[in-house]
Amino acid sequence: MSNEENKINEEALKQQDAAEVEVEAVGTDADIEWNEEADESAAKIAELEAALLASEARVKEQQDSVLRAKAEVENMRRRTEQEIDKARKYALNRFAEELLPVIDNLERAIQAADAESEAVKPLLEGVELTHKTFVDVVSKFGLKEINPEGQPFNPEWHQAMSIQESPDHESNTVMFVMQKAMN
């Protein structure tokens, strides 16, 4: 090989090396850009995943809040119904307590009346009908007359007016009812 050929070969090698260096530089720039884009994408993905987790946590928290609110509303509705029911029962009991003396007085009037007297018969019938109407109206509202006569005395339910000994009754037995109760 001649000198000239060597120079041409050397020059070709130099050009080839320069082209490779240039390709490597271009490849490196592309790699850098690609890596930067990949890093940006990874950062964006991480950011979106964090936002998703935060959103899911918020949704779960709001679902829990909704469930608690529903439970609270249900509890409030139940408590309100119970309070209304109690108030209704209390009002009914108070009303019945006020009617009991009227019913007792009508019963006393019936017992005291002379059923044989023709002059008293129409009046007695009116009192009996009034008594029956009162008892029917009170029973419509679920109240029943309690007559403990002949039953054992219960201090939770009965009020003793007097104590008497009787050979016909056992000890601690209600012998006579002065004022009836309703339940």
From Swiss-Prot:
Which keywords describe this protein according to UniProt?
Chaperone, Cytoplasm, Stress response
Q: Where is this region: Disordered?
A: 1-20
Q: Which InterPro entries does the record cross-reference, listed alphabetically?
A: GrpE, GrpE_coiled_coil, GrpE_head
GO terms assigned for molecular function: adenyl-nucleotide exchange factor activity; protein homodimerization activity; protein-folding chaperone binding; unfolded protein binding
Please state the span of the N-terminal signal peptide per the UniProt entry: none
GO biological process terms on file: protein folding
Q: Name one GO cellular component term.
A: cytosol
| SUPFAM superfamilies, sorted | Coiled-coil domain of nucleotide exchange factor GrpE, Head domain of nucleotide exchange factor GrpE
Q: What does this protein do?
A: Participates actively in the response to hyperosmotic and heat shock by preventing the aggregation of stress-denatured proteins, in association with DnaK and GrpE. It is the nucleotide exchange factor for DnaK and may function as a thermosensor. Unfolded proteins bind initially to DnaJ; upon interaction with the DnaJ-bound protein, DnaK hydrolyzes its bound ATP, resulting in the formation of a stable complex. GrpE releases ADP from DnaK; ATP binding to DnaK triggers the release of the substrate protein, thus completing the reaction cycle.
Family per similarity comment: Belongs to the GrpE family.
Its quaternary structure?
Answer: Homodimer.
What's the protein called, per UniProt? Answer: Protein GrpE
Q: Which organism is it from?
A: Vibrio vulnificus (strain CMCP6)
Lineage, opening ranks: Bacteria, Pseudomonadati, Pseudomonadota, Gammaproteobacteria, Vibrionales
Q: Which gene encodes it?
A: grpE
